[in-house]
């Protein structure tokens, strides 16, 4: 018997930007498909017209491509199983809804939202879990037709509900969780498969699509576990074999231990936000893969090729995955250190221009200056937008000194060191990092001061900061005019302090 060709799908709703959780779902499906030389399908689930955001699907596809996730079939690529937007498949859904109605497995329901809410309130008051109860209980076929005709005459629009068999167990062997089962009386009663506006519900449309698109494995988030028994009801009613299901654990905030929620403002949760900050796509791909999947060995840095080769759903965790911002920054920094410098230059330049620190129209000389700036900070940056803050001493005319910095330059040897350094620095033939270091060594010889007492006053006076890149590199990048202004300002502050 030939081995079944694996077909998976990522099926987002175009309700906004690409969320970390959705990106993980797409990524795991992508890795599973590529590892098994299978097919990745992109399907847009846009049946909820009220929640759809204009440009939402385009934004999601762009960010998937940015991450390095591609697909074989989809709305932009076509394929043998299209259309790949649910809004374009309405006739297909209607065909199977009518089939279920004709077979007596589904029916029109005219209960209003007010009646349904009153029913739920009554059930809650009785201590019963809210559920739909069959509105035609005990009625003959003719009586049901009369009741439906009367509802139609009132102008009521029906939904279509599917019958849930009584005393049934709906179970599946989950690829992540193992054996999962639900009793039919816990599903909530006969559920809606077609809304009043004629659009199918999620739990119906997804079954039709997965079956007709020959999806073999459904890897999705833990929040879909409760949907699965409803989908199994539909599969059974249509006489179809369901795919294999795997439900990935929740992603939690590592600091609060709570589920990562879109309302949690302590964590950036959309791929586009990380893109704008200058995170690298390979680093994000690497980090997201580790949210609920454990590689063999101790290493945490992997290329996409390595992840495709080693991906095994058996190593998906049953415990919640902790979203650790510091770990993401560390991983991205590993990639930044090794990244092509031209790529970093493009990203950092964009960040500096967005912050208004560098003009949009940039000269070749200024471009070279920015290149040097990026090169000296590349090792430090967790993401390129950090350069806006950590390199601010290069853009401010006269940065204020902190209390700690003022205390440093008030020390006994500070003024003589600063004055001697200014003299030595202005005597060098070229204003370079090497010449700046030569001036520092000459200052040491002339003053007899060394170590921190030598370097700290010079750094503060020349750059107006206790921290920064190598002092020689910083002085070269700042240039002679700015460094002299900084030193003169520092000496004036000392004079104002009577030192």
UniProtKB/Swiss-Prot annotation:
One of its GO terms (biological process) is glutamyl-tRNA aminoacylation. Disulfide bonds: none annotated. Its EC number is 6.1.1.17. It catalyses: tRNA(Glu) + L-glutamate + ATP = L-glutamyl-tRNA(Glu) + AMP + diphosphate. It is an enzyme of class 6 (ligase). Keywords: Aminoacyl-tRNA synthetase, ATP-binding, Cytoplasm, Ligase, Nucleotide-binding, Protein biosynthesis. A motif ('HIGH' region) lies at residues 12-22. ATP binds at residue 262. GO terms for molecular function: ATP binding; glutamate-tRNA ligase activity; tRNA binding; zinc ion binding. One of its GO terms (cellular component) is cytosol. PROSITE patterns: AA_TRNA_LIGASE_I. Its main location: cytoplasm. It is found in: Cytoplasm. NCBIfam families: gltX_bact. Belongs to the class-I aminoacyl-tRNA synthetase family. Glutamate--tRNA ligase type 1 subfamily. Monomer. Catalyzes the attachment of glutamate to tRNA(Glu) in a two-step reaction: glutamate is first activated by ATP to form Glu-AMP and then transferred to the acceptor end of tRNA(Glu). This is Glutamate--tRNA ligase.
């Amino acid at each position: 018997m030939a081995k079944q060709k694996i077909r998976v799908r990522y099926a987002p709703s175009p309700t906004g930007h690409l969320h970390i959780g959705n990106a993980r779902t797409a990524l795991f499906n992508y890795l599973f498909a590529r590892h098994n030389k299978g097919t990745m399908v992109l399907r847009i689930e846009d049946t909820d017209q009220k929640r759809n955001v204009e440009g939402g699907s385009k934004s999601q596809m762009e960010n998937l491509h940015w991450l390095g996730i591609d697909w074989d079939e989809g709305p932009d690529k076509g394929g043998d199983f299209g259309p790949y937007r649910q809004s374009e498949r309405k006739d297909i859904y209607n065909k199977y809804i009518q089939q279920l109605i004709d077979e007596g497995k589904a029916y029109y329901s005219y209960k209003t939202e007010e009646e349904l809410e009153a029913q739920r309130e009554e059930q809650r008051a009785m201590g019963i879990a809210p559920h739909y109860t069959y509105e035609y209980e005990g009625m003959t076929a003719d009586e049901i037709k009369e009741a439906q005709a009367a509802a139609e005459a009132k102008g009521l629009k029906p939904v279509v509900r599917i019958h849930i068999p009584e005393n049934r167990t709906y179970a599946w062997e989950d690829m992540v969780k193992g054996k999962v089962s639900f009793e039919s009386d816990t599903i909530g009663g006969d559920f809606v498969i077609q809304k009043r506006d004629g659009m199918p519900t999620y739990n119906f449309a997804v079954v039709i699509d997965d079956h007709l698109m020959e999806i073999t494995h459904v890897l999705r988030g833990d929040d879909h576990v409760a949907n699965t028994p409803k989908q199994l009801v539909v599969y059974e009613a249509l006489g179809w074999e369901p795919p294999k299901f795997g439900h990935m654990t929740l992603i939690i905030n590592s600091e609060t231990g709570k589920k990562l929620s879109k309302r949690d403002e302590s964590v950036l949760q959309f791929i586009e936000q990380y893109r704008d900050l200058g995170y690298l796509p390979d680093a994000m791909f690497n980090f997201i893969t580790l949210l609920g999947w454990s590689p063999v060995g101790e290493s945490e840095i992997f290329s996409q090729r390595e992840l495709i080769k080693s991906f095994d759903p058996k190593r998906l965790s049953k415990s919640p995955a902790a979203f650790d911002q510091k770990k993401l920054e560390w991983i991205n920094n590993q990639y930044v250190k090794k990244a092509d410098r031209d790529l970093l230059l493009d990203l950092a330049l964009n960040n500096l221009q967005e912050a208004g620190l560098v003009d949009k129209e940039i000269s070749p000389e200024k471009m070279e200056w920015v290149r040097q700036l990026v090169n000296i900070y590349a090792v430090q940056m967790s993401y390129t937008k950090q350069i806006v803050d950590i390199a601010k001493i290069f853009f401010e005319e006269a940065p204020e000194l902190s209390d700690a910095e003022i205390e440093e330059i008030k020390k006994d040897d500070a003024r003589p060191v600063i004055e001697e350094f200014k003299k030595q620095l202005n005597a060098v033939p070229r204003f370079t990092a090497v010449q700046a270091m030569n001036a520092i060594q000459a200052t040491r010889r002339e003053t007899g001061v060394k170590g921190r007492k030598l370097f700290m006053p010079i750094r503060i006076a020349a750059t107006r900061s206790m921290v920064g890149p190598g002092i020689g590199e910083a002085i070269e990048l700042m240039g002679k005019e700015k460094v002299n202004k900084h030193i003169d300002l520092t000496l004036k502050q000392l004079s104002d302090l009577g030192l």
